[in-house]
From Swiss-Prot:
Its main location: cytoplasm. This is Elongation factor P. Involved in peptide bond synthesis. Stimulates efficient translation and peptide-bond synthesis on native or reconstituted 70S ribosomes in vitro. Probably functions indirectly by altering the affinity of the ribosome for aminoacyl-tRNA, thus increasing their reactivity as acceptors for peptidyl transferase. SUPFAM superfamilies: Nucleic acid-binding proteins (SSF50249), Translation proteins SH3-like domain (SSF50104). GO terms for molecular function: translation elongation factor activity. Pfam families: EFP (PF01132), EFP_N (PF08207), Elong-fact-P_C (PF09285). It comes from Xanthobacter autotrophicus (strain ATCC BAA-1158 / Py2). Belongs to the elongation factor P family. GO terms for cellular component: cytoplasm. The gene is efp. Gene3D superfamilies: 2.30.30.30, Nucleic acid-binding proteins.
Amino acid sequence: MVKVIASSLRKGNVVDIDDKLYVVLTAENIHPGKGTPVTQLDMRRISDGVKISERYRTTEQVERAFVEDRPHTFLYEDSDGYTFMNPENFDQVIVTKDVMGDSAVYLQEGMECMLSTHNGVPIAIELPARVTLEIVDTEPTVKGQTASSSYKPAKLSNGVRTMVPPHISAGTRVVIMTADNSYVERAKD
């Protein structure tokens, strides 16, 4: 554990408060016209997912936990959770469903992810920013609909719904942002 000033915390940092680990979701430095500047932290407790909001004076000390980030390759999913392999030493790590969260729908066999561990225990996983998926269902294009920049709903091969341009049809492979399920472009493969 390392003590740091609250204003140096950023999104993704892990802090130790009362022997519980929290991941920082947002960190905002607020400088009011009158009074001392403060740092507003929105955090999620790693053990059970409870979200909290804390305010610290910018010079206050906070304990930042040592977190190790290493690339891992996704292998498979089973009843225990999601199995990842470290490509350096071929060790396999099981990540539980609650650590994986909503991003599990984007996992594909062989996908490279960044796994964060604290004392050897997986606490967070970061997927690639973009994934390529196939459109399995979408509304047909209506003639003249392309005049305006309208989007239509589409269902991806992993079950996620997104909005795509009118020229995209079922069977087309598209690139999707994993952070917000948004369409980026047609896949170039």
